[in-house]
Amino acid sequence: MAKHLALSVAAAVAVSWLAASSAAAAGFYEKFDVVGAGDHVRVVSDDGKTQQVALTLDRSSGSGFTSKDTYLFGEFSVQMKLVGGNSAGTVTSFYLSSGEGDGHDEIDIEFMGNLSGNPYVMNTNVWANGDGKKEHQFYLWFDPTADFHTYKIIWNPQNIIFQVDDVPVRTFKKYDDLAYPQSKPMRLHATLWDGSYWATRHGDVKIDWSGAPFVVSYRGYSTNACVNNNPAGGWSSSWCPEGTSAWIHRELDGAELGTVAWAERNYMSYNYCADGWRFPQGFPAECYRK
């Protein structure tokens, strides 16, 4: 489910930040904008160097942040520790979006909470020119609430790669005759919100507010990306930082494609290219291509 729906909640909710120390928060404020209820976010430093951001969700508000810059291609990663216990109905996200319009582009990583003892679902999705419905969903091979794990999006002109702890789990390839996010600059977003209408068992399981507040922690944010703050888009290598060569032409090799196949075989819980009920007139064109 795209965050243009989610953020209609988050935007109304609005979020701001309480910093445990002004020094810890200063660098964060240089990179991100936040709005809203100040007591729903904390920016702290564990060791004087590492920033940790805690987002909170309760009945009154969700929380989130968005990058000041917009990007056209890049490598984006963050470490996250998800909501523990009964997290049913909650949605935690790390994603890129060009905005809320009908023709928007978006690249999603979302975590859909579940009842205690049941696994989280990691939802990946790609939107191009307003066309989404390209979800691959996975259970994880570890408990994402017990410790921090690294989630990464690599977005370049050839493909989009989703990684978990440096393990590729999905690649979405560009085809010249099909829509692909390549012209609209996107901002980075992170949110924690109430997705009861959708997130857990197709909305059958709602948030148990007796367990609030729900908290998710972010740290170790890293980006190597081409900054493009021109709404009209366009791309030039001059906008890209040092180190761009590590990802700008990156495609998965045979061994990495084997890792994707391993993830699909052992942990995939949903593949839009196998959902005939959803696509009775035929699957999207990319489903038929290798």
Curated annotation (Swiss-Prot):
The keyword Disulfide bond belongs to this UniProt entry's keyword annotation: yes
Induction: By gibberellic acid (GA3). Accumulation continues to increase throughout 24 hours of GA3 treatment. Very little effect by other plant hormones like brassinolide (BL), 6-benzyladenine (BA), indole-3-acetic acid (IAA), and abscisic acid (ABA). Inhibitory effect from uniconazole, a potent GA biosynthesis inhibitor.
Glycosylation sites: N114
GO biological process: cell wall biogenesis; cell wall organization; xyloglucan metabolic process
A single GO molecular function term of this UniProt record: polysaccharide binding
Domain (GH16): residue spans on this chain: 26-218
Residues the record lists as binding xyloglucan: E110, N123, T124, N125, K133, K134, E135, Y197, W198, R278
Record keywords: Apoplast, Cell wall, Cell wall biogenesis/degradation, Disulfide bond, Glycoprotein, Glycosidase, Hydrolase, Secreted, Signal, Transferase
Tissue note: Transcript strongly detected in leaf sheaths. Weakly or not expressed in leaf blades, roots and calli. Accumulation of transcript detected in shoot apex meristem, vascular tissues, young leaves, vascular bundles of leaf sheaths, and peripheral cylinder of the vascular bundles and fibers in the nodal region.
Highest rank taxon of the organism: Eukaryota
Catalysed reactions listed for this entry: breaks a beta-(1->4) bond in the backbone of a xyloglucan and transfers the xyloglucanyl segment on to O-4 of the non-reducing terminal glucose residue of an acceptor, which can be a xyloglucan or an oligosaccharide of xyloglucan
EC number: 2.4.1.207
Active site positions, chain numbering: E106 (nucleophile), E110 (proton donor)
Disulfide pattern: C226-C240, C273-C287
Position of the signal peptide: 1-25
GO cellular component terms, semicolon-separated: apoplast
Disruption phenotype: Plants exhibit up to 50% growth reduction when they reach maturity.
PANTHER family the UniProt entry points to: XYLOGLUCAN ENDOTRANSGLUCOSYLASE/HYDROLASE PROTEIN 8-RELATED
Additional free-text comment from the UniProt record: Lower level of XTH8 transcript detected in Tanginbozu, a GA-deficient semidwarf mutant, and higher level detected in Slender rice 1 (slr1), a GA-insensitive mutant showing a constitutive GA-response phenotype.
UniProt-recorded name of the protein: Xyloglucan endotransglycosylase/hydrolase protein 8
Origin species: Oryza sativa subsp. japonica (Rice)
